[in-house]
Amino acid sequence: MDEGIGEQRARWEKGTRFYEALVERDLFGDWVLTLVWGRRGSSLGRVQHRPHPSAIAAHEAVETVARRRAHRGYARIR
């Protein structure tokens, strides 16, 4: 069902702040959205892993994150 839909990486930045989203399979073959955010040049920050039932659901979650980041003034880097 998820053929043709693979891993995805996106990054947003605003000033010294960054936000990353990564869609990939975990060791069990399940799709996981990993969110990483913090300040550039700092070891402080947060990581959050959100499991999703399919690659499509994970990619839709990235689009939701993208809309939220744009609304908050972040520029998409990749």
What is the predicted role of each segment?
Residues M1-V32:
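Short N-terminal "domain-start" leader segments
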Residues R9-E13, G38-R39, R69-R72:
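A broad, low-specificity signal for short, low-complexity segments enriched in glycine/proline
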Residues V62-R78:
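C-terminal structural segments of small proteins and small subunits
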Residues S54-V62:
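Short amphipathic alpha-helices within nucleic acid-binding modules
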Residues V23-Q48, E63, R72:
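Short aromatic-glycine-(Arg/Gly/Cys) micro-motifs in beta-strand/loop hairpins
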